[in-house]
Design a protein with these regions (language model features):
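Conserved N-terminal entry element of GNAT/NAT acetyltransferase domains
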Residues: 2-31, 149-171
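Amide-forming acyltransferase catalytic core, primarily the GNAT-like/NAT-type
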Residues: 35, 137-227, 237
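A short helix-loop-beta-strand connector motif used in the catalytic cores of GNAT acetyltransferases and
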Residues: 49, 54-75, 86-88, 142, ...
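Conserved beta-strand in the GNAT
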Residues: 66, 72-80, 87-93, 206, ...
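Conserved catalytic-core motifs of GNAT/GCN5-like acyltransferases
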Residues: 81, 119-123, 138-152, 277-289
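Conserved acetyl-CoA-binding loop-helix of GNAT-fold acetyltransferases
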Residues: 94, 100-113, 236-248, 268
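Conserved GNAT acetyl-CoA-binding A-motif
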Residues: 114-126, 251-261, 281
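Conserved active-site tyrosine of GNAT-family acetyltransferases
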Residues: 131-137, 270
């Protein structure tokens, strides 16, 4: 997710903004650096997963940048590459007491350079859409975080949909899940999934019909609540079966799921469980992305990596 302060990104092309402000040193970040940046994200209310960073770095360890003044972190951004055609931007942050000094835009430029000629996606707060457009991003859809203690929904009408929800390890493992995921995301991401499905505290389940994977989901502990993502399924009934099973693994504790408003069935699912809409983000891209099954997306993976 990106939630830059307006002073750091209010106009990406402001005359007089230095390319790199004096004393700012922008370098690639380490996992230890990212523990600090994740703390900033938590302060912004993003509720990052407790073990997210390791999976993020597994996809592209060179895609994380930190700006320092006298050795102290003051700014950050991630631009994670997926193959040759797609990248995703997140964690665009400047330390709250140092905003308005040009550190944000300098870090932004350093991060975007890592993407090369790839199409870049991001999830940014709607208030910053005009700023992102100035850097070539165009709106695709809005995503809303739904959160709360899940309530038991009314029973679904009609006969139960066929299928079984099982651990992903019993559903063909990484190979089967990566194949299904590739139809639901703008790029293939097996390195990320290998870590995400097996992350500390992560519970990953698949829905199988006649031996074929028809959806999968992951729930993981966050700083404030459990986080569900991704939640991908062929049908609303399948998504509901997966969501129920994921919730059961944490005793129906408070959860959050990031729901694309471009899929009305996903919104209906979150509302059926009594979850409350919170802040929204704008999914934006700098260019075309390969077609993917947006109707299968009932919860995105993360705001930070798409």
């Amino acid at each position: 997710m990106t939630r830059p302060d307006p002073h750091t990104s209010g106009n990406h092309r402001t005359a007089g903004t230095p390319e790199v402000p004096e004393r700012l040193d922008i370098t690639r970040a380490t996992l230890d650096d990212w523990a600090v940046i994740s703390g900033w994200a938590a302060e912004e209310g993003w509720n990052p997963g407790l073990a997210d960073a390791r999976s993020f770095f597994a996809q592209d360890p060179d895609g994380f940048f930190v700006g320092r003044i006298d050795g102290e972190p003051v700014s950050a951004i991630s631009v994670v590459n997926y193959g040759d055609d797609y990248a995703f931007l997140g964690f665009y942050l400047v330390r709250s007491d140092l905003r308005g000094r040009g550190y944000g835009i300098a870090t932004w430029k350093a991060g975007l350079a890592h993407a090369g000629g790839r199409t870049v996606g991001l999830d940014g707060v709607p208030a910053q859409q005009d700023n992102y457009r100035k850097s070539g991003f165009e709106l695709a859809h809005t995503t809303v975080r739904y959160a709360g203690v899940p309530q038991a929904p009314r029973p679904a009408e009609g006969d139960p949909a066929p299928g079984t929800v099982i651990p992903v390890s019993e559903a063909g493992g990484l190979k089967s899940i990566a194949l299904y995921d590739s139809a639901c995301y703008p790029a293939e991401r097996p390195r990320f999934l290998a870590s995400w499905l097996a992350g500390d505290g992560h519970r990953a389940l698949a829905r199988v019909v006649d031996g074929r994977v028809t959806g999968y989901g992951v729930i993981r502990p966050g700083r404030e609540t459990f986080r569900v993502g991704p939640l991908f399924a062929d049908t609303p009934q399948g998504a509901r079966a997966l969501f129920d099973a994921l919730l059961a693994t944490v005793g129906r504790a408070p959860v959050a799921v990031d729901v694309p408003e471009s899929n009305p069935a996903a919104v209906a699912l979150a509302e059926a469980y009594g979850l409350t809409p919170g802040f929204a983000t704008a999914r934006m891209y700098t260019g075309p992305v390969r077609p993917f099954a947006q109707e299968r997306i009932f919860g995105i993976t993360t705001f930070e990596l798409g």
